[in-house]
């Protein structure tokens, strides 16, 4: 009987463990709780802005090709509306180019060289943000150490707003190099974003939700790319070639999405709570509390750095950026409308 009592007396202990764990689990915040959304918002805004900026190039190039293809516009009103893109209404009652077409062109259309950007300009435009992102990712670590995550978000927000303003200026003046300057500046900001968004979540998300919050950045990058593509489809298919096509308005409307996301990034930085982890050094460069940025030497970080570089390099070698930037041209050359 004593043996039985001992067995029974141990039963509550066996039951208490799981109950305690369940109780602890119940006290953790839900995914849609304000506590978790306050952390996850950086992934949502940062990922969407990053994705939209990736999808920006293909749509902008497509719209520019439409705006500079003067032969598409069938009336005087429509032709005059795209006069800033090199079109004019001729005495022959057709909309054509102000510049003389290349009579030595090997293409079917001798004015083909006047439609859209040249191969060189398209390459510069497509690579501008990539160059900026490379610079931004390099300086991100120093930026975080100097300013912390919260101020880094604010700085990125300001840079993104300025870059978006340059996009609108480029549309108004039809200045290619202003557009490229905006893309480089946006790239620098996004290079930092790709570092600070996952880092903020890693440091502040509840352990139960850290993995779910962690994947949101990539999810919303994909959403941003899809958003840009859907807007491009709508803007392209709704052009009225018989009346005022309002191409400048379409460019401004498309760029306005980037502007809204940039302002959202700035506001996120302004109202974001400070990270629970901080980097702190005294005047001699030694840690005086918080996390020590010199805790690990280069030798210890070499393998993780190598793995990160190989993973990122493999992703780029798939050609995803080339496909995203030149998707309309690729499908056009394949005979797909």
Swiss-Prot record:
Residues in compartment: Cytoplasmic = 1-43, 141-152, 197-214, 272-300
State the Gene Ontology terms under molecular function.
Answer: hexose transmembrane transporter activity
Q: Spell out the InterPro entries in the cross-references.
A: GLUT, MFS_dom, MFS_sugar_transport-like, MFS_trans_sf, Sugar/inositol_transpt
Please state the protein's primary subcellular location: membrane
Ligase as a keyword? Answer: no
Localization per record? Membrane
Q: One GO cellular component term, please give it.
A: membrane
Q: Which residues are glycosylated?
A: 69
Alphabetical keyword list: Glycoprotein, Membrane, Sugar transport, Transmembrane, Transmembrane helix, Transport
Extracellular side residue ranges read 65-119, 174-175, 236-250, 322-337
Membrane-spanning residues: 44-64, 120-140, 153-173, 176-196, 215-235, 251-271, 301-321
* Record Gene3D superfamilies: MFS general substrate transporter like domains
Give the region (Disordered) as residue ranges. Answer: 1-22
Which Pfam families does this one have?
A: Sugar_tr
How does the protein's chain sit in the membrane according to the entry?
A: Multi-pass membrane protein
State the family named in the UniProt similarity comment for this chain: Belongs to the major facilitator superfamily. Sugar transporter (TC 2.A.1.1) family.
Task performed by this protein: Facilitative glucose transporter.
Name by which UniProt lists this protein: Glucose transporter 2C
- Give the organism, scientific name: Trypanosoma brucei brucei
